Amino acid sequence: MGLQVKDESKRVLQFFLRYPMKPGQRNTIKLDIIDLSTASNQYSRQYLADIDRYAICQSQATMFSHKLVALMDRYERFGSIAGRDIYDIHYFFVNGFSYDSKVLSERTGLKASVYLEKLLTFIEKKVNMRNIDEDLNVLLPPEKFKAIRQSLKTEVLILLKDETNRLRGV
């Protein structure tokens, strides 16, 4: 396959692998190896077109659930906030993906409605423009970054409020 390790994390099992491709085309894949397994995780076999291979991957619902937990988990474990966690939450909600409340409950020990309200409060109090700017300005194309940076936090809060209201039957 000709994969080369372009970069890797010193703290977690994360690799950026470069593969041969024509100039101007995507040539890097991010590989996260998560050694945290929950009984509620769902997996399926997926075709990864960029590398012409199949892999066993988390379902979208499982992945979204872990993304919802990642923001506060990262803060509790490392004292840091990653703008990409906010962006990922936004992406999953806006694209109409569902999360798995069983995974949320297993990871947090809370009912989904309680956890999402806690997450909403956390984002309101802790996430600021600096968190978003420092992380996303290097991950997104400039036009996309400019378009989303001012509204990202507000939109995520609205999406979470809508979801907590839905869960409460409001």
What are these regions (language model features)?
Residues 1-170:
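Structured mid-to-C-terminal alpha-helical surface segments
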